[in-house]
Amino acid sequence: MTSTSALPLALIQLEVPPAIVVERIGEQPRWFIDALDLQPDDYLIVRPHLGESLPQFDQISGAILSGSWAMVTDHAEWSERSAAWVRAAIDAALPLLGVCYGHQLMAYALGGKVADNPNGWERGLLPLRCKAAMQRDALLSALPERFSAWLSHRQSVIAPPPQAQVLATSEKDPCQILRYSPQALSVQFHPEFSRHIMSACLPPDVSDSVADADIEGADWARQLLTAFWQQTRPQASQAQGA
């Protein structure tokens, strides 16, 4: 039998960035690998847009669904296939974290509505506000009432799935963090981003001043990402055979 400690985290890459972005900073999995300091045995990369099969649930410890330059409302074949996989993964109680496109895809897969945000783009380092229910969330209770995170998106979750709990908002987006089950959540912001990644992702017609700011003090979004990763790991006592 495969040891739980050997199971990798699936990094589900949803489409590929523009060539100029890839040239500067690589593709989405690299950003998560660097943010979490993952070693080669810690993860596997799955690319549904290249026709790759999504992983069997008993072969992975959890999954992160990446951001994308695509739109959920385009209903691409690979996106719809990934949405069906999300529904099955939720039923299987697999730890899931959706980020930006992944956030919208999870909400859509579970019955929410995704569309262009009527309030327009969110870009750059922006303040978020957590709801009181966050303090009762086992994974997220350490987050402060307010923190800043990197954002870059035009579409949003306009209406969350009926069973989802909204845990954070921003000025332009009422669904910044959604909790679907004890194992599954999604975030509209980019916990894997740094100022360098944000700057590299800006299109030519957007001022570099969007990325002028930087996080001061604790990077709470990154801590959320790290906490999710640790959630997928076996307990230390189990790893030691206690």
Where are these regions (language model features)?
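N-terminal beta1-alpha1 cap of cysteine-dependent amidohydrolase-like domains
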Residues: 1-84, 88-92, 205, 209-242
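Amide-donor transfer/coupling interface in amidating biosynthetic enzymes
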Residues: 3-14, 35, 91, 130-242
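Surface-exposed, flexible loop/turn segments at secondary-structure boundaries
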Residues: 17, 51, 71, 104, ...
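Short glycine-/acidic-enriched loop or helix-start segments at secondary-structure transitions
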Residues: 21-22, 55, 74-75, 107-109, ...
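Conserved beta-strand segments of alpha/beta enzyme cores
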Residues: 42-44, 113, 148, 165
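Short loop/edge segments at beta-strand edges and connector loops
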Residues: 45-48, 116, 151
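Small/polar loops that bind or transfer phosphate-bearing groups
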Residues: 45-48, 98, 189
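Cysteine-nucleophile active-site neighborhood
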Residues: 66-134
